[in-house]
């Protein structure tokens, strides 16, 4: 099965190193590790980091045929980790991934992925609209990936209204709920159900809860599925949500039940948090 992953590819700059990242790339790489195929739709700059980015994407097994080169610096993000290894991101604006043009030919595919961060630019919003026109009969997976201040009511609603499957964290859920409904968020499961039922195309809403596991709401059957977290010694949570979503999606498209998909995704996320890399080799 083939994934098209749209959005930011950037370098996470730590005090002592730099790592290639961005949720769409991490997601695509984990989808490939799960047994699928993936191409990334993004843009890099005509600079040394741009060339390094292309090499890094290919090493992860992700296709680069839909990567554009634009007249802007390759994306960067300054990252710090707190005492619990939770990352804080300082995302630079006006970078290459803010200027992603529609690919001329992205070939056949089964599923499109995007998140809200790359929608911070009007150009990218137009590109996603064009991609969605090619998604008749395809699955659309949205990772909300809320990064203040890079979201608006328009982009949140746009993402939710075009998604078959939505993934977000329990930390993002109140922000998304209050952005959509303009009132305080109820308990997590009620909030997820109201959000999902409020957008007719949504089939599944997945909420990750860190050390408390995850749950999924099946909008068609009005049923909740829950899964506890797999125990792991946490080194870094960077990439854990991406691995969770990618493995869930691959399992789901392979015909597995929602409960089994949650279990497989939880195992994958536990492996990632035990490593320093967002995509462990």
Model-found features: residue ranges?
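Glycine-rich phosphate/adenosyl-contacting loop at the front of the ribokinase-like
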Residues: 1-62, 233-234
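Conserved phosphate-binding/catalytic region of the ribokinase-like
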Residues: 180, 184-281
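Conserved N-terminal subdomain of the carbohydrate kinase-like
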Residues: 37-116
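Structural alpha-helical scaffold elements that stabilize or flank donor/cofactor-binding regions
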Residues: 105, 158-159, 198
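Structural motif
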Residues: 2-4, 110-111, 165, 204
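Conserved beta-alpha-beta core of the PfkB/ribokinase-like small-molecule kinase fold
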Residues: 111, 116-190, 212-213
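Residues at the starts of beta-strands that form the adenosine-phosphate
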Residues: 37-39, 63, 138-141, 164-165, ...
């Amino acid at each position: 099965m083939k994934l098209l992953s749209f959005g930011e590819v950037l370098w996470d700059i730590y005090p002592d190193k730099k790592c290639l990242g961005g949720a769409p790339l991490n997601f695509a790489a984990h989808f490939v590790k799960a047994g699928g195929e993936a191409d990334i739709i993004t843009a890099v700059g005509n600079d040394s980091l741009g060339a390094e980015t292309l090499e890094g994407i290919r090493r992860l097994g992700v296709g680069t045929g839909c990567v554009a080169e634009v007249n802007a610096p390759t994306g960067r993000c300054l990252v710090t980790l707190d005492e619990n290894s939770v990352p804080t991101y300082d995302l630079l604006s006006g970078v290459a991934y803010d200027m992603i043009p529609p690919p001329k030919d992205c070939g056949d595919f089964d599923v499109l992925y995007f998140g809200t961060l790359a929608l911070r630019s009007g150009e990218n919003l137009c590109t996603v609209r064009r991609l969605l026109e090619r998604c008749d009969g395809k699955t659309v997976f949205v990772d909300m990936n809320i990064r203040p201040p890079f979201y608006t009511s328009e982009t949140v609603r746009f993402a939710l209204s075009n998604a078959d499957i939505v993934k977000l964290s329990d930390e993002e859920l109140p922000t998304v709920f209050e952005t959509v409904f303009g009132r305080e968020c109820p308990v997590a499961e009620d909030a997820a159900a109201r959000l999902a039922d409020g957008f007719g195309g949504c089939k599944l809403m997945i909420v990750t809860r860190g050390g408390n596991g995850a749950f999924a709401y099946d909008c068609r059957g009005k049923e909740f599925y829950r899964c506890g977290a797999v125990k792991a010694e946490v080194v870094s949570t960077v990439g854990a949500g991406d691995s969770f979503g990618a493995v869930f999606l691959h399992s789901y498209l392979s015909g597995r039940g929602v409960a089994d998909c949650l279990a497989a995704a939880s195992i994958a996320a536990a492996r990632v948090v035990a490593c320093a890399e967002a995509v462990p080799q």
